[in-house]
């Protein structure tokens, strides 16, 4: 770990901090001219596989935005290649899996002993950690088993996840075998990122919101929990993020992740209440609000901070990744506003909007005050 005492890492551990830490999912991406300049010369996978380039775009984004953490630039699907499942990106379609996994034989052919071939990601982590030298922490990440399996089985993105759910329902033993292989690979992959200098690991479960609570508990929860438990042995806090997951929050808490990432579809304080305030939370501004005028954007960010109420364990973020056409200045201004507002003793008042089912009491603590009062993102 390169920055174990940073406000971000401490917030992940639900420890008191002077202000709310902030970073953004997909903070290095197409909305930044600097990233687009690199992409003119290199493909996405080339950037991922060349540690110096991956480190460059990671560092550039964090420094331009002035955020409190740098998330390593990589692609969610990289582990699929070392399992023997090649993929490519198609314009307008996104990732395309060349040989979808649809049978027991397909699962049997998947390899689990080649995670070391992803060493280029760990090397990029090491370069970023050395550059920041403890000034800000580095976030490593991996895809969650369900989300990776969905891509593998569907052959790419999906609206209904018919093929993935068919395997879950009709061949549960095959599903579990696939999950176990994904747990092994993602655990090894993420552990190497921590060894290389990552302070925190985020597990992205981008498509988990398509599941009922019953299906989540049966087909997903045990496998995510296995990854979380294994990675926590490294000493790194674990963030578990899923979209459209409001109904799943109590079950997601059972993974024992240190932080649960929230999307924007549920008020922060209501979500934290559903989690019984048993962990830290991250979020949860709608990414599209970054296209709004400053007055509206500021009001919505302030509302989230007020719903956090100064409770220890809130990390400000979006409810999903930054969108490609987002104005860079809005992202920079938002980061600075969160930092300055949360550092002020007067920065916590009742929420401006009344769209939450839980009440937030007026108070004036420093951000990260340990006394429970309201919810978080």
List where the protein language model places each region.
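Short glycine/proline- and acidic residue-enriched helix-loop micro-motifs
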Residues: 40-43, 103-113, 168-177
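Intrinsic disorder/low-complexity segments
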Residues: 343-377
């Amino acid at each position: 770990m390169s920055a174990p005492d940073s406000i971000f890492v401490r917030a992940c551990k639900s420890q008191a901090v002077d202000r709310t830490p902030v970073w953004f999912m997909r903070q290095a991406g197409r909305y930044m001219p600097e990233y687009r300049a690199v992409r003119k010369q290199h493909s996405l996978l080339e950037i991922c596989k060349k540690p110096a380039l991956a480190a460059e775009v990671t560092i550039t984004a964090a420094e331009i935005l002035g955020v409190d953490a740098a998330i390593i630039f990589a692609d969610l699907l990289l582990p699929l290649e070392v399992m023997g499942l090649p993929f490519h990106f198609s314009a307008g379609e996104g990732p395309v899996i060349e040989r979808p996994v649809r049978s027991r034989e397909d699962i049997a052919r998947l390899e689990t002993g080649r995670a070391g071939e992803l060493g280029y990601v760990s090397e990029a982590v090491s370069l970023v950690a050395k550059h920041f030298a403890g000034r800000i922490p580095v976030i490593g990440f991996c895809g969650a088993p369900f989300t990776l399996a969905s891509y593998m089985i569907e052959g790419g993105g999906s609206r209904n996840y018919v093929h993935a759910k068919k395997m879950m329902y009709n061949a549960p033993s095959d599903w579990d075998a696939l999950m176990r292989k994904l747990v092994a690979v993602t655990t090894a992959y993420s552990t190497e990122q921590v060894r290389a200098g990552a302070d925190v690991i985020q597990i992205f479960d981008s498509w988990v919101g398509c599941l009922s609570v019953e299906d989540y508990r049966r087909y997903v929860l045990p496998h995510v929990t296995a990854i979380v438990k294994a990675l926590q042995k490294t000493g790194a806090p674990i963030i578990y993020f899923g979209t459209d997951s409001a109904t799943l929050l109590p079950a997601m808490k059972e993974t024992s992740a240190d932080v649960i990432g929230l999307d924007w579809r549920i008020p922060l304080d209501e979500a934290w209440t559903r989690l019984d305030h048993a962990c830290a939370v991250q979020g949860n501004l709608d990414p599209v609000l970054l296209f709004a005028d400053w007055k509206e954007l500021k009001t919505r960010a302030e509302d989230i901070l007020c719903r956090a109420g100064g409770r220890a364990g809130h990390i400000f973020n979006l409810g999903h990744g930054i969108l490609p056409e987002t104005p860079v200045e809005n992202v920079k201004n938002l980061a600075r506003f969160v930092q300055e507002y949360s550092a002020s003793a007067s920065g916590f008042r009742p929420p401006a909007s009344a769209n939450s089912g839980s009440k937030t009491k007026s108070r004036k603590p420093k951000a990260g005050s340990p006394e429970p009062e309201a919810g978080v993102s």
